[in-house]
Amino acid sequence: MNLSELRPAPGARKKPTRKGQGIGSGLGKTAGKGHKGQNARSGGGVRPGFEGGQMPLQRRFPKRGFTNIFKKQITAINLDELNVFEAGTEVTPELLLEAGLIKKVGDGVKILGDGILEKALTVKVHAFSKSAVEKITAAGGKAEVI
């Protein structure tokens, strides 16, 4: 068997229907568009979201909220992800970036207390959760806010 001898499985390929090519085709004469009317015309049809004149869904619901331009983009990371570092390492946002644990520093880095820290680390970031501080000190490390 060669690549040039390969054939599609029976029934895998279906010929496209040629609309308007005789009434025997089943899609002749009006080509599935019905008689006259907006949808039978060239370029006919209603725009997306048009509901026949009734108030569209998009306009029935009220506007809500706003975008706070002063919102802080704080990058969060869980405690168990810090186990990749050697004991005694000083963990900073720059080190987390280099290690690929975070994608960007943004407006700061926050350590969350999910998981268990198995090594004594000095962690210097912008914010900590209460449980994260407790677990870092329990492991023999230090949590410093920069």
Swiss-Prot record:
Protein name: Large ribosomal subunit protein uL15
Record carries keyword rRNA-binding: yes
Keyword Nucleotidyltransferase: no
UniProt keyword terms in alphabetical order: Ribonucleoprotein, Ribosomal protein, RNA-binding, rRNA-binding
Subunit structure of this chain's protein: Part of the 50S ribosomal subunit.
Gly residues compositional bias, start-end: 21-31, 42-52
Any GO CC annotation of this UniProt entry: cytosolic large ribosomal subunit
Region Disordered, residue ranges: 1-58
Naturally occurring in which organism (per UniProt): Desulforamulus reducens (strain ATCC BAA-1160 / DSM 100696 / MI-1)
